[in-house]
Amino acid sequence: VEMSKVLGQPVVVVNKAGAGGTMGATEVANAAKDGHTMGMLPVGPMTTQPNLRTLPYGPDSFDYVCLVYSNPQLLLVRADAPYKTYGELVAHAKQNPGKLNYGSSGIGSVPHLAVVALAKAANIDVFHVPHKGEADALASILGGHITMFVSHPTFMTAHADKIRALFVLAPNRLP
């Protein structure tokens, strides 16, 4: 509503999930360059995905306006999970190799690669379950279909009674 008032025309918001954010980025890149299409793109489709596959867009496909937000990522588990710390999760994974899984917003997304790095550092075997987007991965962890999920603090605060953060992937501790 506020954007409509400022711009003097209707604003339609379309959430386009899929392929780690590249579906939405492709749609924005292919839109007419008439100033009527804006994209709020996460970091993955702009930095990670171009290094993993050939995409129908590149850095020059967009006119960049601003950085809207920057937030840390959290390693989330269900509130009723048997582990209360990352160390306990690692110990559980080592005792049950290949039994733990994790969701992400897509192959090559920041959450996917974050868990790959964590698993490699801890020398544990976990199974990746890619989702269409973060909302789908959140539904999977809330439903007990995945063991863990890396996401931003918004999901944690909105579902604090159902999920728990084991640690923050950021240079500083969160308040």
Regions found by a protein language model. Give the residues of each.
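Signal peptide-proximal N-terminal region
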Residues: 1-12
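Hinge/capping helix and adjacent helix->loop/strand transition within the periplasmic-binding protein
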Residues: 3-5, 30-36, 43, 50-136, ...
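Early extracytoplasmic/lumenal segment of secretory-pathway proteins
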Residues: 10-26
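Structural signature of the Rossmann-like NAD(P)-dependent dehydrogenase/reductase core
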Residues: 15, 40, 104, 164-169
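Short helices/loops that flank or line small-molecule/ion binding pockets
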Residues: 23-33, 116-121, 135-145, 154-162
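Paired acidic/hydrophobic, glycine-rich loop segments that form the ligand-binding mouth/hinge
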Residues: 35-41, 147-151, 165-167
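Short gly/ser/thr-rich secondary-structure transition/capping motifs
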Residues: 55-59, 144-151
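Short, intrinsically disordered, charge-balanced linker/junction segments flanking boundaries
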Residues: 156, 171-175
